[in-house]
């Protein structure tokens, strides 16, 4: 019996983690615009049964989202595969592409990977979220069940799945900012940070992630390719609906104050886009 053909567009840490996870059960075809990362030609990828889209969605200077990398993948898409969009996109994006490219099949499935431990995270997911038409999410559910023994597979509409991803990322980003504020206050009044932290996290409701100040990179606040762009994208998006996300906005302001190394500004094409907004 022949294996399922799985294509991957974008061979960064997300694409690599997906390739690693599905290699035992599928024939893989991987394409990246960087020739050094590309393993197969684009036509072969679009001829697969399923195609994971793992391309960047950086932010413009005003915080809004650059979807040009995602758009370019759909411009060359075919009607054969089910396209599984893993790139972080704002609510309504998958729906919009499905309407624009009505001949192709698209669902959204957010990734919850940490770049440093992406492969392990892929194998130990606490849940899989599939957003789109039920007939399509059922097919993708079957694909995931070939590889993972995860009972918590949530099937919903694409808009809900897209929002869920932003809820996660902006919550954790804001959590980092809150902890930095606590640390500043602790230092100012001469309290014992380690004791305070131990007492704080002993309440199981707090959780055990995104608590360290400085963070895992030895720096205050958060940087990298995900949190800064996702926070700004959601803030920009919410303004269109006259919703002020004041807590998230305040967290971003704190991050700008404490984070000396604004490394996301140097990650053109991943975190920031210098293209002109449309």
Task: Locate each region found by the language model.
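NAD(P)+-binding Rossmann beta1-loop-alpha1 motif at the extreme N-terminus of oxidoreductases
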Residues: 1-46
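NAD(P)-dependent Rossmann-like dehydrogenase/reductase catalytic/cofactor-binding core
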Residues: 2-4, 26, 190-278
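Short, well-ordered alpha-helices that flank and scaffold nucleotide-derived cofactor binding pockets
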Residues: 20-24, 75, 99, 236
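Alpha-helix C-terminal capping/helix-to-coil transition sites in glycosyltransferase folds
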Residues: 46-47, 79, 125
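Rossmann-like NAD(P)(H) cofactor-binding subdomain of soluble oxidoreductases
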Residues: 50, 58-117
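Structural motif
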Residues: 50-54, 129
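Internal alpha-helical scaffold of NAD(P)-dependent oxidoreductase catalytic cores
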Residues: 98-107, 118-209, 237-244, 250, ...
């Amino acid at each position: 019996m022949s294996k399922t053909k799985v294509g991957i567009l974008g061979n960064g840490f997300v694409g690599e983690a997906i390739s690693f996870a599905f290699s035992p059960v599928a024939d893989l075809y991987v394409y990246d615009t960087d020739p050094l990362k590309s393993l197969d030609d684009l036509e072969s990828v679009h001829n697969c049964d399923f195609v994971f889209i793992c391309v960047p969605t950086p932010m413009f200077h005003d915080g809004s989202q650059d979807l040009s990398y995602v758009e370019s993948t759909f411009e060359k898409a075919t009607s054969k595969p089910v396209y599984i969009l893993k790139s972080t996109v704002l609510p309504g994006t998958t729906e919009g592409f499905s309407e624009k490219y009505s001949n192709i099949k698209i669902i959204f499935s957010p990734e919850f990977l940490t770049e440093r431990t992406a492969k392990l995270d892929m194998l130990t997911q606490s849940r899989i979220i599939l957003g789109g038409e039920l007939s399509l999410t059922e097919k993708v559910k079957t694909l995931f069940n070939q590889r993972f023994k995860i009972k918590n597979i949530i099937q919903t509409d694409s808009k809900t799945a897209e929002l869920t991803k932003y809820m996660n990322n902006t919550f954790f980003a804001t959590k980092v900012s809150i902890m930095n504020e606590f640390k500043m206050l602790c230092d100012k009044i001469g309290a014992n940070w380690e004791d305070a932290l131990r007492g704080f996290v002993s309440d199981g409701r707090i959780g055990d992630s995104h608590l360290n100040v400085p963070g895992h990179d030895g720096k205050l606040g958060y940087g990298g390719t995900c949190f800064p762009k996702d926070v700004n994208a959601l803030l920009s998006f919410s303004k269109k609906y006259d919703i002020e996300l004041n807590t998230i906005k305040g967290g971003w302001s704190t991050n700008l104050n404490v984070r000396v190394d604004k490394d996301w500004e140097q990650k053109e094409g991943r975190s920031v886009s210098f293209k002109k907004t449309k």
